[in-house]
Design a protein with these regions (language model features):
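Sec-dependent bacterial lipoprotein signal peptides
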Residues: 1-17
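C-terminal/domain-edge helix-coil "capping" segments
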Residues: 22-26, 109-114, 120-150
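Composition-driven detection of intrinsically disordered, low-complexity segments
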Residues: 8-9, 25, 90
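Surface-exposed short loop/turn segments
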Residues: 59-131
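Contiguous N-terminal and early-domain "leader" segments and peripheral loops that mark the onset or edge
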Residues: 11, 20-22, 100
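A structural "domain/chain start" motif
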Residues: 16-60, 113-117, 146-150
Length: 150
C-alpha cells in the first residue's frame, strides 16, 4: 500500500502541465519538408524557446535547413509563483505562456500558423517556470508531425 501511495505522490508532483492549440491554420501536408529550423524573436525567453525547438528537431533527426522555417513569437510569459505552486498546487501560482507560431517555406511563403497556450500548474518543488517552454516546444513538434510537415 505504501508503495502505491509513493508512486501516486511522485506522479502528482511532476504532473499539472498542459498545452492548448488554438487559431490553427495548419493544413495536412502531402509531402514532408526535408528539414526545418526555428527562429524566434530577439529576446531572452524567445531565444530559449528557439533553442528548445531546435534541440527537439535535432533529437527527431530533422536536418537543420531552411526548407521549413518555424517562426515563434512569445506573446505572453508569466512565471507565476513557485512557492504557491509548491505549497498549494492544483493550478495556483501556475506559470503560463502564449505563443504564435508561423511556418514559412524556403521561398518565404507562409504555409501554416497556430497559437499555443501552455500552463505549468505544479511540479517537484514548485517546478521551474521556464518548463512551460519545454511543453510549448514539444507541442510545436507534435503538431508539425501530426500534419506531416516533418
Amino acid at each position: 500500500m505504501m508503495k502505491k501511495y509513493i508512486i501516486f505522490l511522485l506522479i502528482f508532483a511532476i504532473s499539472g502541465c498542459g498545452t492548448k492549440i488554438y487559431n490553427e491554420n495548419l493544413p495536412q501536408q502531402n509531402q514532408k519538408y526535408l528539414g526545418a529550423t526555428a527562429k524566434c524573436d530577439d529576446n531572452k525567453i524567445n531565444k530559449k524557446l528557439e533553442t528548445k525547438i531546435n534541440e527537439l528537431l535535432k533529437k527527431e533527426k530533422i536536418p537543420a535547413t531552411n526548407d521549413l522555417s518555424i517562426n515563434c513569437n512569445l506573446l505572453k510569459f508569466d512565471e507565476g509563483n513557485r512557492a504557491v505552486r509548491y505549497l498549494i498546487s492544483f493550478g495556483a501560482g501556475a506559470a503560463t505562456s502564449s505563443t504564435n507560431i508561423k511556418l514559412y517555406n524556403k521561398n518565404q511563403n507562409i504555409v501554416g500558423e497556430f497559437d499555443i497556450n501552455a500552463t505549468m500548474g505544479m511540479g517537484g518543488f514548485g517546478g521551474d517556470a521556464e518548463e512551460v517552454l519545454d511543453f510549448t516546444a514539444q507541442e510545436v513538434i507534435n503538431r508539425l508531425k501530426a500534419k506531416n510537415f516533418i
